[in-house]
């Protein structure tokens, strides 16, 4: 089992990851930036107001965080930063499908 990723917390960290690779999925967009230091992967979550009100956005964020925690963290590459931009489909997707999609995007496969 891999180590748990750290969190991206500062706006500057989120903006830096935007310069990296974008991996589009049905339930979310994953932005990836290789820091080049081989350290613990870091992850940040964001859900835009387009998805819904605060309750809906928080539910989407919680589902994504749990999917990363229980399953997809093992597929994160050390030294990478990830920003997961949630979409409203992430709320209705079966949890197993959400986990599998996250793992695929972290590995960089379609």
Swiss-Prot record:
Q: What does the record give as EC number?
A: 3.1.26.5
Q: Name one GO biological process term.
A: tRNA 5'-leader removal
UniProt keyword Transmembrane, yes or no = no
Where on the tree of life does the source sit, at the highest rank? Bacteria
Q: Which controlled-vocabulary keywords does the entry list?
A: Endonuclease, Hydrolase, Nuclease, RNA-binding, tRNA processing
Q: Sorted alphabetically, which PROSITE patterns does this protein's record hold? A: RIBONUCLEASE_P
Q: Indicate yes or no for the key word Nucleotide-binding.
A: no
Q: Which reaction does it catalyse?
A: Endonucleolytic cleavage of RNA, removing 5'-extranucleotides from tRNA precursor
EC class of the enzyme, as a word: hydrolase
An example Gene Ontology molecular-function term? 3'-tRNA processing endoribonuclease activity
Which regions form coiled coils? none
| CC terms in the record's Gene Ontology section | ribonuclease P complex
- HAMAP family (UniProt xref): RNase_P (MF_00227)
Q: How does it assemble?
A: Consists of a catalytic RNA component (M1 or rnpB) and a protein subunit.
Q: Which family does it belong to?
A: Belongs to the RnpA family.
Q: What does this protein do?
A: RNaseP catalyzes the removal of the 5'-leader sequence from pre-tRNA to produce the mature 5'-terminus. It can also cleave other RNA substrates such as 4.5S RNA. The protein component plays an auxiliary but essential role in vivo by binding to the 5'-leader sequence and broadening the substrate specificity of the ribozyme.
Can you say what this protein is called?
Ribonuclease P protein component
Q: Please tell me the species this chain comes from.
A: Mesorhizobium japonicum (strain LMG 29417 / CECT 9101 / MAFF 303099) (Mesorhizobium loti (strain MAFF 303099))
